[in-house]
Amino acid sequence: MLRYCFIYGILAFVLSGCSLVAQKPADDYQLLAMQHLQQQKNWALDGRLALADDKDSVSLSISWRHDPQLDELDLVGPLGQGRVKISVTSNQVVVDDGDSRKVFDGQANAIISEQLGLDLPIESLKYWVLGVSDPRLAFTEQPGGFYQAGWLVRYREMQDVNSDTLPKKMTAEKDKARIKLIVDQWILS
């Protein structure tokens, strides 16, 4: 019995240490101090994404690679079931679900939302995930986030990445649409 208590004690100690690694409460979020990240040209993130509205919801793993010419999103369903790769350039969206590859011309937000069946404002989200507002649109700062284009964007937890502080947990809500992102890993270059 004493042996099991010792093992559980060690396990609790080790696991609690994992949660102390460079994470900060959302109180550390300050939009103006982060605006320089609008200039971040290349980045990548791996994490978990949840999308929901009043009719549907989905939870996905996400890998997102961004550079000025291309956004590549790899979305995978629970237990690896279902995969969609989305590539976005300034004038084209390519959606590949493994069975078919579809090429669309037009506005990325509308195309992606139609293909996923849920609202995903990709053109602004590529800024929001960095903790900054979309520089092309007006915004109103709020405690822990901001309003932009009808969306309330909030940062629940921050994390140190290189010499910057970036979101660990963020949410965005507009009417009945909800986006929740948890970033497990950032790569800035």
Residue spans for each PLM region:
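Solvent-exposed loop/turn segments connecting transmembrane beta-strands
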Residues: D53-S57, P78-Q81, D175-K176
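Flexible, processing/modification-adjacent segments and terminal tails
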Residues: D99-A149
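An acidic-aromatic
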Residues: L70-D119
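Beta-strand-dominated lipid-handling architectures at cellular/organellar boundaries
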Residues: A44-D46, R65, K85-S87, Q92-V94, ...
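Gly/Pro-enriched, hydrophobic low-complexity segments
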Residues: G131-S189
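Bacterial Sec signal peptide processing site at the extreme N-terminus
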Residues: A12-Q35
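Bacterial N-terminal signal peptides that target proteins for export
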Residues: M1-I7
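A short, Trp-centered hydrophobic/proline-enriched beta-strand micro-motif
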Residues: Q35-K55
